[in-house]
């Protein structure tokens, strides 16, 4: 993938993630929120469950944003498209599908297996 195209796609991804994170933070109560007395225990359980789901989505969005920022840094360092583990070129089709990919398919599979 051409670096100018990659940069544009990564910047668009970063901007979209920033918007999503902002929305999630606006709907996600902080740790001190909701400390009043719930109307009943079912309401409290429902609220906690929704809060847990929102927190999980927020963590995933932040993690994905970190990956996008790392890819932008690799662009600046002229190492974009090289696997961070083995150093081989990441196939163009993979970068088209995942512009933020840091690893080739083989190394990503090994990484995922190690971090389960």
Protein language model features and the residues they cover:
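Short, cysteine/histidine-rich loop/knuckle motifs that typically chelate Zn2+
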Residues: 85-86, 106
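Cys/His-enriched microdomains
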Residues: 81-84, 102
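Short functional micro-motifs and their immediate structural scaffolds
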Residues: 91, 112
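Interaction interfaces in information-processing and related assembly proteins
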Residues: 1-77, 97, 115-116
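Cysteine-rich micro-motifs
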Residues: 100-110
């Amino acid at each position: 993938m051409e670096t100018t195209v990659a940069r544009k796609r990564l910047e668009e991804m970063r901007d979209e993630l920033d918007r999503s994170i902002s929305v999630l933070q606006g709907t996600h109560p902080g740790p001190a929120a909701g400390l009043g007395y719930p109307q009943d225990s079912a309401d409290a359980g429902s609220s906690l469950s929704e809060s847990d789901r929102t927190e999980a989505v927020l963590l995933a969005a932040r993690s994905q944003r970190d990956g996008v920022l790392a890819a932008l840094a690799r662009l600046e360092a002229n190492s974009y498209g090289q696997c961070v583990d083995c150093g081989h070129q990441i196939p163009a089709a993979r970068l088209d599908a995942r512009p933020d990919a840091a690893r080739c398919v083989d190394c990503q599979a090994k990484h995922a297996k190690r971090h389960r």
